[in-house]
């Protein structure tokens, strides 16, 4: 049975379906970057409200700025913008839900003017983003907006025909300002530290280059709430499509699969209204920082620990890595002994319970989360997920063998060869330069840690860290992952550099 509006009434009983009249829903949210995560997260919270008979003015219009977004747009359009959320977990209470919160999907390359008009329409009150780290055109090491990118220069020269997210947002806000229309809130839903601030800095940097008066108006009137978002959402595979079809009879060309867990903590700073998402589990707060640091350092940082060591051992799925007792012990030890001591108190959160939940989520056998997904884009992820913990340890003068092992494992992983002789691609925009540095025969450590856009200045300046990194890398190269894990878990590598030097 093909998924579309006409067939909704024929869905099996166990499949949830929209309980509202989709034709009556206005699109108050424009979401740029419709992928799996948005469809499994923000759209689901909105769907829950719509099913309660609320949020009728907060439907979603999707937007694609890249040519690659056409496949998603055409797929959803062929299904009347319906799709299936297919929860995968190890318990029996997982849900299958047809979602109708997205009511339209615009492609910038088809009609940029139509998109600008949509953004400038007073009905649009929130513009949300999942555009990944690279979409913010911000240098990872300096945090500065990169105005020299060709697409940015194009948008500054052609403000009526933009190509980038900031070109579109700025032109739409300029039109709203000229018409006396309130601005929209810009809400980043990307998995970035201080994501709202990152979006604000990028948009204001662009606007300043275009029109100083417009820059000042945006700075004084547009809200950019920070948010912590969480839901493990693997890439949809043909196996998932077949599994959904077999289980429910639904023929969905692009369902989204996700774990049962989801969480969203948002700063309550919206300049033009918002849905009452708190009624369906969203937590609003004055400051998202402690929640953000907890999630990014414990969940994402531990993912990095599991992923690179697991890949070297030949594991291909997260649950396989967590079934490896030696590796799962290392991951929990990293959480307990390295990350937790550096975290501030998180209001309303029991950290021990939170860590137990993470281990359970990582071990989910049904979701088959791919190690390759977790390993991808390490040059962007590690500076955000692991290096803050390492910097805290360097500043505190404490031993750092586990944190350093994660980075040494990444370096070793970049060779593209696991310990069973299997190969894998390096999925990273910087793959060529990273592999070149990781495969040097001489001065490997100095050159690898000299990648300033990854490690910055402070970390390579720590002689203790450099010596520990060298030791852990040599161990991986000569003894292998298991012996290195055993040594690391059995000892605290000390901060005495002379002692370290004798071990290398």
Can you say where each PLM-predicted feature lies in the sequence?
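Substrate/ligand-engaging "lid" and interaction regions
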Residues: 1-504
